């Protein structure tokens, strides 16, 4: 291994160790000694890469921002229904948050006040959601009377709330939780002709793979429609209430 390779590995180890500390303790209570110890390096090695705690936090946030922007980019740049891409992006981000402590810590840091913050990740998420909903409106995918402005407020409140709740219980990020949210929202958001084709569990390679319409190759199984099924008690009534908020 070359000296440059070792330096890269050390820096990445420090970023991950810092993310673990920031996630568990927050920016103020995290300390550099614990970060260097967690990475298995000396304090001197840490200061070779980062001048101070704010610089370490900035590196964690930078890595998290890159991962989140990549996820958002998949939604913006992919083909197909804009509403389905919005669903897919939320599932992709949830998987990132479940799997990557750096992404979780980066979002927490971005919500805290500390010196050197240069980005607003929640604003970027808002713009992603608003952009996809505006595209959905332009393509005639939204139900009559549903506006991107009011819809984005509901989606943002729900997804941001899930992220905050998941800091204490990552079960909030599990696919069933997010799928239930979309089972509730999609019948209120989507034009009637599209509802059956949208998959609230996401349409990516790790998603359910079963469209809500229930059409499966070979007719072996049928997916339940959005807002129905034994695992979604009371959803039609709840969906009606949410629909009023969206209009």
Predicted regions and their residues:
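Basic, helix-initiating cap at the start of DNA-binding domains
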Residues: 1-25, 32-38, 54-58, 77
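N-terminal intrinsically disordered/low-complexity leader segments
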Residues: 1-9, 168, 196-247
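Short amphipathic helical patch at the helix-1/turn junction of helix-turn-helix
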Residues: 26-27, 47
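Short hydrophobic/aromatic patch on the recognition helix
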Residues: 39-50
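DNA major-groove recognition helix of helix-turn-helix
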Residues: 50, 60-61
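Hydrophobic alpha-helical connector segments
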Residues: 59, 70-99, 114, 148, ...
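Short, basic, alpha-helical segments at the C-terminal edge of helix-turn-helix-like DNA-binding modules
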Residues: 62-68
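Hydrophobic/aromatic-rich alpha-helical bundle segments in the mid-to-C-terminal region
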Residues: 104-111, 115, 119, 126, ...
């Amino acid at each position: 291994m070359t000296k440059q390779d070792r330096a890269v590995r050390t820096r990445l180890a420090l970023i991950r160790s810092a993310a673990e500390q920031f996630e568990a303790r927050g920016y103020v209570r995290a300390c550099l000694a614990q970060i260097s110890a967690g990475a298995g390096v000396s304090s001197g090695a840490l200061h070779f890469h980062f001048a101070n705690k704010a610089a370490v936090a900035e590196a964690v946030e930078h890595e998290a921002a890159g991962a989140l922007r990549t996820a958002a980019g998949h939604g913006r740049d992919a083909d197909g229904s804009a509403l389905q891409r919005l669903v897919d992006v939320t599932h992709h981000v949830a998987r990132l948050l479940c799997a990557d402590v750096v992404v979780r810590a980066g979002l927490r840091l971005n919500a805290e006040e500390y010196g050197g913050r240069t980005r607003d990740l929640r604003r970027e998420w808002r713009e992603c959601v608003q952009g996809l909903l505006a595209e959905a409106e332009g393509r005639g995918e939204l139900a009559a009377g549903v506006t991107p402005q009011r819809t984005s407020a509901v989606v943002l409140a729900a997804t941001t709330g899930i992220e905050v709740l998941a800091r204490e219980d990552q079960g909030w990020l599990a696919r069933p939780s997010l799928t239930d949210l979309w089972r509730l929202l999609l019948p209120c958001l989507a034009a009637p002709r599209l509802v059956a084709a949208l998959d609230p569990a996401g349409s990516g390679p790790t998603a359910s793979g079963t469209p809500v319409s229930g059409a499966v190759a070979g007719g072996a199984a049928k997916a339940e429609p959005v807002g129905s099924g034994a695992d979604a008690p009371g959803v039609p009534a709840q969906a009606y209430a949410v629909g009023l908020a969206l209009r």
